[in-house]
Amino acid sequence: MSLPKNKSFKNDEYSNIKFYQPIGLYILDCQSPLGAIPSLKNGKLDPWDHIESTMGLTTLGHYDAAKLGFNWLFNNQNSDGSWFSEFKNDQVIQANKQTHFSCYVTVGLLHFFKITKDIDFIRSNWQKASKAINFSINLQNTNGTIPWCINEDNLPDEDYLITASSSILKSLECAMALFNILEDKDKAKLERWEFAYNKLRQAIRNPDGLFDLKISRKRFSMDWYYPVISGAFSTFESKDFIKKTINKFYID
């Protein structure tokens, strides 16, 4: 199956789930029998894109395939809660460990629960998801920042990406929501996550000198909108933030 053809929106057709079904079929066509979903058909897989694709399957009603995607993910989780950065044909091809990759599983799981209400599936993977969150926040510095990865020598990289950090912040929010949904009784865990969330949120709100130390990323639009969708800012602040930056990236 080939990629869906480009098409323009007409009237309200994009609000009908049928409009998106070809996307779901394409993701299914890319998924391996074991559940892996590469970023490109027959290409490499990274865990963040894999989770995004799994969420696409959930949205379009392919619940068993989505579960298979989560199962692949947890079957390939490292003992420290992380995932390696890239796979191909279920083999590791990039052995660093990106911190926002591990956290993002909670976004996928909360999304799956919101649609399916399958709390048993969430509960069966909760310990592994909690371990994934802890992998990232274990690396948090006193200023709130979290290294973007552990390199192949198992050392923290000395840079902190605003995009990755924004993703981690949203993932922590979803983790705490799942904690309450599952009625987890480990209050120490929740307090630790709340502390990490607040420290990271403060860093994202006051980013000067903290992020993207090795290379300027001001020309990348995602570095401007990721902090907005992370939840670090209020609605009013977000609108003001967008007004100040939209002319740099918006093309009429």
What are the functions of these language-model segments?
Residues 113-117, 176, 180-183:
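Short coil/turn linking the two alpha-helices of tandem helical-hairpin repeats
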Residues 54, 110, 173-176, 228:
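Amphipathic alpha-helical segments within well-ordered protein domains
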Residues 1-48, 59-73, 77-83, 136, ...:
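Low-complexity, Ser/Thr/Pro/Gly-enriched N-terminal "stalk/linker" regions
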Residues 1-6, 46, 52, 112, ...:
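Long, acidic, intrinsically disordered low-complexity segments
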Residues 14, 43-46, 124-127, 131-133, ...:
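Extended ligand-binding clefts on enzyme/binding-domain cores
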Residues 83-95, 147-160:
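Acidic/His metal-coordination segments adjacent to aromatic residues that form catalytic metal sites
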Residues 25-28, 51, 55, 228-229:
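Amphipathic alpha-helical repeat scaffolds
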Residues 46-141, 165, 169:
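Aromatic-rich carbohydrate-recognition surfaces in CAZymes
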